[in-house]
């Protein structure tokens, strides 16, 4: 039997090697991305066409006699005065200081794709009224906000004004370009490019009535309009060119952020002279840094910031999208004279943003702030907030491709206990499944998965197994057979099941845009369907861009067919969103709607925050990749996706011990904390390093677990309000220009400032501490620093600079145990960092840590702690919540305090009691021992 197992193992290794070899052929298995596998704008025909239109007089005119005004919607026709094609514009005022603009063809040959399921609901509207009109413009007032919209007819333009201040302008540069659908012109003797592909455009009513000179005028078929080839792949484009583009001008704005995912700086760069930023979910092998290439996820949201204003643009389109950014001055634009009139003469700095998408309609939300926190809440009201993760998912995750078998998993599990290291999860990659057949277990390596899971559960730990959305084509594989029989796969343009190449070899791809497919997928996670699973098994969705090794740009053909007759080109960027959604729904379903899910996804879109965590993909064990994870996660946080992390240690290559230690130190302060590694890397569990490095990693893990109450509270705030967990400095210091470009340090909430060490052999770092009149305390030494200032701080390998802002209160657990589940009832220590005014405040959220009872039964606590006038008060911050807990306050550490004569505790219904304390005059730290009060109770502590 042992010999048979050995032969089987060799075969599996050979198969994996074959797939890796194929992947190398497809992707260019080198030390960096093979750029030739991915399009530039010049190679993307619609981007090239859109970008060829230069700023100038727009050919579009609004037909004022077509204007119709409803209670909350203005509709008006736009005519392209060259082609005579009519569009229809819908303008809606929305509550919470937002505006929605939609532009579509008035009479399309076939309906255009409108992105479903991303918005949590149709947003509440605000009443519109016409407050002025002349022969070339209409002034519209929005009842819910202090702003007006001026619609100019010729050339078409929209200007949004607040009082006499111009906030932004739409089509000021004349770059609106809407490629209307048209009948393919077939030259004599040639074949219709759509002929015979099963997806011919239907005849549109009235086409025969259009004069030939109008139909053909200025509509030359440029290369790539009706068929496009990239490398060996052909895109049939049966409906012809359908791209859309529109420009937005932002006077007074020089700093823009967002539109992740890119391995680039936090502040977006001007793209003139290079490629635009690309949004097209792709499996990019060993991605390069500091360029605008597309990566695994796309969130089409851009934030603009100035010391006086914040705005957001949400471009709701799931097709391939490019975003051009240029710097300008308002005096050089078409609305410069208006700006002079409104704001006075003189040049105003300005950023221009141009969006270009391959298909769909123009559907854009303008988020008008005025503060960045207003923009966060506005966007969250549209797409939802970050899902509240289970507490245990905020702990440490140990992963690699791959843990060999059950014995290996249990040995790793024991290793954490033997070396006194906390851990919540162990992960299994693709080798755990039987021949890469997801929802199965390799019978020779994992013959008793439930027993293995039970052993992990006895240590209060969990397991994650990968479930990818490519299904092995195998008639004996139940998942494939059912999906094939039910007709739930993505189809080719001739109606057969689409088949590509991925980890299992030949694979088909479930059509997750179909609600029936998502329901089927969710049902697969029931314990009776996912054999060997249990309640402590959670899920990882990888390769869900989708990744197709032999497809164009390592993804699906754009003319593949989805539910409803839509092409893949229309919805590509939302495919991974649906995979994530269906998987999260499945984990909720298996518990009868009781348990919160944990699902990690590589691909994402606007709204993905509702379903779980994401990570920055297949990074490399290099210092620059350590660095780039900061702006990558900060960018995601700005657009609502807070649960972000990077593979600790780097996925590719082997990190030297110094780099691995520095990565653990940073990962401990990023929202999602997972170590992961490639199949060909050496094992790197912490105890395999020399003792001195083990100790440093143990300390980093200890910092993470100590702060879990703080992390959990931050995630509840993100869930409740839509604010990011990990924040760029400028978010809290919007008028401090120094912070606008900082992306090597960050804030956690408003309380902690973290400056990771991201250079080899560093002996010190430059740290910027913001805030006029604010103080910052080193969390290790309690040394006080005043802001704003830049400090050079010496560092050793054993620590990174972390500061607590004066004026905040941070809850901690001080006993680090095997896992977070072992700590959840431990007592709390409050770290009270006093402001120069002697004040501080903070919150603590507690519930059972894993169910929806906080929602369905209001079983939670949200406590507010405030310090003022030498008194610390605990009170309820949400009276709706009620939760019984044994958690009590064990200690209060007040930083920046003088020595009192006495310290008195007051609780309702009890006499005053004195507390013992200790004061260190050198650090001004006062420690109050064992107040002993339950965290759910109201109490106060007085320093006298």
UniProtKB/Swiss-Prot annotation:
Q: Where is the composition biased (Basic and acidic residues)?
A: 207-225
Q: Which is a Gene Ontology cellular component entry for this protein? A: intracellular membrane-bounded organelle
Q: Where is this region: Disordered?
A: 181-225
Q: Which residues form the active site?
A: 542, 618
Pathway(s) where this gene product acts: Glycan metabolism; N-glycan metabolism
Is the keyword Chloroplast assigned to this protein?
A: no
* GO MF entries: alpha-glucosidase activity; carbohydrate binding; Glc2Man9GlcNAc2 oligosaccharide glucosidase activity; glucan 1,3-alpha-glucosidase activity
Modified residues annotated as Phosphoserine in this record: 52
Q: Which reaction does it catalyse?
A: N(4)-(alpha-D-Glc-(1->3)-alpha-D-Man-(1->2)-alpha-D-Man-(1->2)-alpha-D-Man-(1->3)-[alpha-D-Man-(1->2)-alpha-D-Man-(1->3)-[alpha-D-Man-(1->2)-alpha-D-Man-(1->6)]-alpha-D-Man-(1->6)]-beta-D-Man-(1->4)-beta-D-GlcNAc-(1->4)-beta-D-GlcNAc)-L-asparaginyl-[protein] + H2O = N(4)-(alpha-D-Man-(1->2)-alpha-D-Man-(1->2)-alpha-D-Man-(1->3)-[alpha-D-Man-(1->2)-alpha-D-Man-(1->3)-[alpha-D-Man-(1->2)-alpha-D-Man-(1->6)]-alpha-D-Man-(1->6)]-beta-D-Man-(1->4)-beta-D-GlcNAc-(1->4)-beta-D-GlcNAc)-L-asparaginyl-[protein] (N-glucan mannose isomer 9A1,2,3B1,2,3) + beta-D-glucose; N(4)-(alpha-D-Glc-(1->3)-alpha-D-Glc-(1->3)-alpha-D-Man-(1->2)-alpha-D-Man-(1->2)-alpha-D-Man-(1->3)-[alpha-D-Man-(1->2)-alpha-D-Man-(1->3)-[alpha-D-Man-(1->2)-alpha-D-Man-(1->6)]-alpha-D-Man-(1->6)]-beta-D-Man-(1->4)-beta-D-GlcNAc-(1->4)-beta-D-GlcNAc)-L-asparaginyl-[protein] + H2O = N(4)-(alpha-D-Glc-(1->3)-alpha-D-Man-(1->2)-alpha-D-Man-(1->2)-alpha-D-Man-(1->3)-[alpha-D-Man-(1->2)-alpha-D-Man-(1->3)-[alpha-D-Man-(1->2)-alpha-D-Man-(1->6)]-alpha-D-Man-(1->6)]-beta-D-Man-(1->4)-beta-D-GlcNAc-(1->4)-beta-D-GlcNAc)-L-asparaginyl-[protein] + beta-D-glucose
Family, per entry: Belongs to the glycosyl hydrolase 31 family.
Q: What does this protein do?
A: Catalytic subunit of glucosidase II that cleaves sequentially the 2 innermost alpha-1,3-linked glucose residues from the Glc(2)Man(9)GlcNAc(2) oligosaccharide precursor of immature glycoproteins. Required for PKD1/Polycystin-1 and PKD2/Polycystin-2 maturation and localization to the cell surface and cilia.
Q: Write down what this protein is called.
A: Neutral alpha-glucosidase AB
The record lists the lineage as: Eukaryota, Metazoa, Chordata, Craniata, Vertebrata
Q: Gene for this protein?
A: GANAB
